[in-house]
Amino acid sequence: KYQNWEVTDPECWIPHGYACVRFDSRGAGCSEGFMSPNSPKEIEDLYECIEWAGTQEWSNGKVGMLGISYYSRNQWRIAAKHPPHLTAIIPWEGGNDPYRDSGYHGGIMSQFLERWSKHQVMNIQYGRGENGRKNPNTGESATGPHTLSEEELAKNRVNAFDELKKHPFDDEWHQERRADFSEVKIP
């Protein structure tokens, strides 16, 4: 009932003594701000969220991450930054190389980011309000209380596909969006 696509099922984990927390990235869901998926800023924000969770009174100080696809990719990147409270990750079915995995297959631009942006990212952007998805448990907007115009929404997000087109080679833009596996020190 409370599971969110691509992340853990709290009804499975909570009875075993785990607290489950899912964060909305900046500009997504009910979090205001400029939406920039897969950006270094998003990883900084998630690092702070991990440290927040590790210091709550209900927390034992050990934070783990679990998830598929996008959440998998983020786990590797965050683990390589060594947040003190992160003790384990369980990533699966997620790539680490944005250039080869989702950007340019064999040097040929993939349409993945264009489709993903339209069907996944834009649908969960903060500010969709009345026009956005509803939380199936509460009936409230899952994209914040405000309803912004399409122009305002566009000003509050990066166009990932347009950004990809600016980087046809495996340059710094792609490199700062992948984890350095040699820096991942946790199980």
Residue ranges and their predicted role:
Residues 55-57, 182-183:
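Glycine-rich helix-loop-beta junction characteristic of Rossmann-like nucleotide cofactor-binding loops
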Residues 3-9, 15, 77-184:
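Accessory cap/linker subdomain of secreted extracellular hydrolases
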Residues 25, 183-187:
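Short, conserved helix/loop micro-motifs enriched in His/Cys and acidic residues
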Residues 57-70:
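Alpha/beta-hydrolase fold nucleophile elbow
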Residues 31, 67-72, 93:
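Catalytic nucleophile serine of serine hydrolases
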Residues 19-20, 61-64, 85-90, 187:
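Beta-sheet entry/capping signal
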Residues 1-54, 103, 110:
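Cap/lid segment of the alpha/beta-hydrolase catalytic domain
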